Regions:
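Short beta-strand/helix segments in adaptor/scaffold domains that form protein-protein interfaces
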Residues: 17, 28-29, 61, 78
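C-terminal structural segments of small proteins and small subunits
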Residues: 52-80
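N-terminal glycine-rich anion-binding loops that anchor highly charged ligand groups
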Residues: 31-37
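Solvent-exposed beta-strand sheet faces enriched in polar/charged residues
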Residues: 6, 36, 45, 77-79
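Short amphipathic alpha-helix segments
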Residues: 12-28
Length: 80
């Protein structure tokens, strides 16, 4: 099984990296961009056959290490 995890800043948290990318895109001539938010994508190859157990384990990984839940949200997708 594979776990795909998207970690993003919570909407209320300022994103200086996103602002820098937005500014750079404007400098390169890309206009009409309202906002850029930057995050992380993590893919984990799991040695697990039970989808519910995999979801539970990855949820714990996110809470304990992969995401700073004070300022970040995360979304998990489990695939076989």
């Amino acid at each position: 099984m594979k776990a795909k995890i998207h970690v993003t800043l919570k909407p209320a948290v300022l994103d200086p990296q996103g602002k820098a990318v937005q500014h750079a895109l404007g400098s390169l001539g890309f206009f009409g961009i309202n906002e850029v938010r930057q995050g992380k994508f993590i893919e984990i190859d799991l040695n697990e056959t039970d989808t519910a157990e995999a979801q539970k384990n990855v949820e714990n990984m996110c809470k304990q290490l992969l995401a700073n839940t004070v300022i970040e949200d995360y979304a998990i997708e489990i695939t076989e």
